Each structure stands twice: as C-alpha cells, then as structure tokens.
Amino acid sequence: MQIYDEKSIEIMKISNKKAGIILAIIIVISLAISTIFMFSKQGYHEDELLTYNLANSSKQLNVDGGWNSPKDFNEYLSVSENQRFDYAQVYNNQIIDASHPPFYYALVHTVCSFFPTVFSKWLAYSINVIAMTGALILLYKIAKKISGNNLYALMGAGAYALSLACITTTIYLRMYSTLSFFVLAFMYMSIKLYEKKNTVNIKDCLLLSVITLFGTLTQYYFLMFGGLIGFVFLVFKIKEKCIKDLVKYAVFCFIGIALAMCIYPYILSNVLGGNRGLGSLDLSGIDAITIFTYVIYKLCTYIQVLSKDLFLNQIWLFVLCAFCAIGFGIYFRFIKKQKLNRKAMFAIVPSLVYFIAISMLSPFNSDRYVMASLPIITMLFVFAFIKIFSLIKKENLRLILPISIVLASAIGFATVKPYYTYGKTNLYEPKTDNCLFVGTAMLEWNKCIDKFMQYDSTMIVQNSEMSKTLIDDLDTLATDRGVITNGKIGELASAFMNNGSEKEMSNSMSAIKTDTKLQSLDEVTVYISRLTDEEGTIDYILENTSFENYELIQADYSFDDFYNWYDYFVETESYCNVYRFY
C-alpha cells in the first residue's frame, strides 16, 4: 500500500533543493526550542549527573559520614587537568558501573576535556544537538525512501522535530539522542541495502559495520532494535531469493558486533547479568497476578508517555488517532486491496515491536527507554493520515494535515512541559551555609549534587532504617492503578530498589552525634530522603545535636500527583523533604 497516489505526487512535488532548505529550517527551529528549554532547565535527573561522573572522574565522595566541599563535588563531575582525554579512565568507570558501554561517555569526556574543571549542562547538551541534527536528517531520508515524496518526508520528519518527544530526547543529558541517531542510521542503511538486488557493494557493508559497532557501544537497546530491522531484511531477502545480499548483510553486522565485543568484552555479562530489564529482577515470592497486572499497568504507562510526547498529553487523542490509523489501514488493505510497500515494513515492524517489548521489559516506566522508537512512530502516524487524507477529493482540504501538525506543536509547547526541565525549586538559594544529607544505600544524594555545590560543605550519611510509610504509599498507588498487589508490593519495590546492585546497606547515623563540626553549627539545612525513616531521622538529630527547632524549606512531591510512579523520580528535584534545623 502506497501512502500517496500519483496525482498527489504531481500536485505536491517539491524539489530536492527546496526540501533541503526547509529541512534545515525545521532542524534549526527544533534545536532552538530545545535550547530555550535548556536555559530554563534547573535541576537534573540523577542519571544526567552520573553521565558526567562516569565520563570524567574517578573521584569518590565522602558518603558515609564525611564532609564534602563544592570543590569535591565539582571534581566528581568534571575533568581534572591531569585527566584530560584519559579514555582509560572512562573505560574503567564503565566496567565498574556495569550498566552501559563506553562510547557515549567517551564523547562526553572528549567535550569536557576541552573545558577542564568545568561542570556545565551545555557540554553534554552539545553532543545531543549534533546527534539530533543527524537523527532528523536520517529520519527525513528514511521517510523519503518509504514515501518517494519530499513533501511527505518533510511532514514526517517535521512532525517529530517539532514534538515534545524530540525536545525531551534532546534536553535529556544521556545517550538516547545518540542512540536514536545510530538506530535511524542502521534503519536507513538496511533499507538502502534492501533496494539493491544482488548488487550490494562492500562500501555500504563497511558503513553498516561501523554503524553497528558504534550503536552497540552506545546503548544495548541498539541490539534489540537492530535485530528487529535485521529480521525484516532477512524475511524479505529470503522471499526474494537474494541470498548473496543476505549473507553480506549478516556477515558485516556480525563484524560490527564482534568488534564491539572485542573493544568492550563486558557487553555479554552486562546484557545477560546487568541491571536492565525485568529479567534482572528477583521476582521470586511475588504472585503471578501481581506481575501480570503490573505489566498491564506498565503498558498503560507507556501509552501515557506516548500521549504526552506526541499527542498533547491527551490519551483520548492518541486512542482516536491510533483507531483511525488501524481502522483505515484495514480498509485500504482488505477493501481497497492495497498492500504496504516493503520498505515501510522496515519502519513499522521494528518500531512497534520494540515499543511494546520495552514497555513490558524495561526496568522502570520511563520515556527514555522508548525514545529511539519515537521518531519512526511519529512518522508512521503522519504517513497514516496522509493516506487517509488522500481520500479527500478537494486538494485544498489536504492542507489541514500540515496545518494541524504545526498547530498541535504550538499547543503542545504552550500547554505541556517536557520531562527533565525541573525548575520549580528554591533549593538553589541556600538558607544556611552548611548542609546535611540523610539517605539510604540507594545513593539518593547523587540527585542533589548540583544543589550541594551551593553550600560551603555538605555531610552525607546513610540510614539503614527505611521509610515506615513508603511501602504503604506504593501499595496504595499501585492498587489505585489496577495492580493486584496481594500485599506483595514491598517485594516488588525491593526488587527494583536493589536491581542489579552491589550496594551495601550501612548506617553512619552515629556521625551526626560524634562529628565536631556539625555539633558546632548554629543552623544547618537537612535533606531527608523519601526512602529513609524521616520521623526517626528528625528525632535522632534533635536528640544528638544542639539543634532544638526545625522548619520545612521545601516539601517533597506526593506519589498521588503522578499516574506513573517513575514520573515522581523524573519530576522531583531532590527525592527529599528539606528542612532548616536551628
């Protein structure tokens, strides 16, 4: 089934030169919007701060009862003068972390090495800008391969470029813009190689190997997405009996993966035994009905994510558009007897299967895990409606679609706030000179490092006593959202909180009692983690220091504010209630 008819092509033709200019304008507008949100970004997701630490530093902070200075925190996040372009350190950090391959961190380290001792959100952002520019160009090229029409390709790429999905991916200081680039590059090369019937050349195959190599070394989800694209290539080449092409394709993909494993041999152990996915969790003792209903809840959560990123945060609008796309797809296939062209299947099958699989298997319900699929999903929705609008006989009415895309983008940016911008906190204006953080083995302090840099010194301690209300709060949240917990939400929460971890539970609360500096202070700002026993912590501080009073500076968010419990971690600035003791 073509997404256009021949008459439409003639009416809506646009030259390659004009298309290139328009695409450049779209990319500039998209990146300008992202940059505006970056200016307002105040606060970080904990993994964004880990980006800088894992890319730049071997610095260890005092997190078990010791004091840290702003210089300590800066050294934890930035490149020191004597560690510039030290890629061995980057490599070693990833071995220790055992979560991701090293290529993205090497990119961050390279940029930061030009600015030693500097911690700035703009350094990692610059990588995302370059990666997203390439991703949007590739999305346009893929759309043109599928549609054969410059204007339709611009609409497909433009809809994503001007969406919250694109902006969120660009401003999130992790590897997902880079992952999106390599996924789209692999898809584009696969379609290009598919078009060549037993005429695949070595140059293209080598490029495929390079893409596979760096995609694998960027994020392990590349292997899943790439595998799905490769499966489509396999099926069609077998049906067309182009076995030589298939063999070349498979061999050079394997070469790319093999080279990645030679460069970073920990890939296999990270993928099979790391801390990503439900398979890495210890779910023994949790009822099957709890797991099943939780997976359903996860799917609903990702529908919510898709609705926010692409459909103005309106689930009904997503459902309506999906219903129309599927309904008219059935109409065109079985009533009009029109088949999809095979190049479209390179986009449809991998993106949808990937999205659904990640929805069920991802360790947390986060938009970041499906970011790589959103460019293609956006394009597919646009193409579906281009096909639907082709039924309209009046050509002028077909302008409704591009106008709707622009209007929806404007409404979206005016009414829906992207993830990862934060900016609702007063914690960057310290009320005291010194700070005390009380958390757990979950290392919640990592979320707050940029805030700690505002104090003269910060003491970090661990409390082995968990929150007395956390499990009940999570149980209520889960039950209200359809999860049948059977009282086992504690085990499920524990499985996630200790996921793939080698964290050691310790208790350094006694340092509050014995530390002479803390005892000498007249006042101190105290961060108390959501995960720890808040009431017990407050009592301990009052009983073992000279402080007699306390007041709330900023309250933590409530779980009730979010449908997706992971949104709490995405939206909140600190995971803490913050007090002033005096």
PLM features: residue spans?
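Specific aromatic-rich, kink-prone transmembrane helix
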Residues: 110, 138-141, 158-162, 166, ...
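Transmembrane signal-anchor helices characteristic of membrane glycosylation enzymes that use polyprenol
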Residues: 19-79, 255-270, 411
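Signature aromatic-anchored transmembrane alpha helix within multi-pass, membrane-resident enzymes
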Residues: 24-27, 210, 254, 385-417
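Transmembrane-helix signature of polytopic, membrane-embedded enzymes
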Residues: 122, 139-162
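Transmembrane alpha-helix segments characteristic
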Residues: 154-157, 207, 212, 251-257, ...
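Membrane-interface helix-loop-helix junctions at transmembrane boundaries of multi-pass membrane enzymes
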Residues: 17-18, 140, 144-147, 151, ...
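Transmembrane-lumen/periplasm boundary regions of multi-pass, lipid-linked membrane glycan transferases
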Residues: 73, 214-217, 224-234, 238-240, ...
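Hydrophobic/aromatic-rich transmembrane helices and adjacent perimembrane loops
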Residues: 179, 224, 319, 341, ...
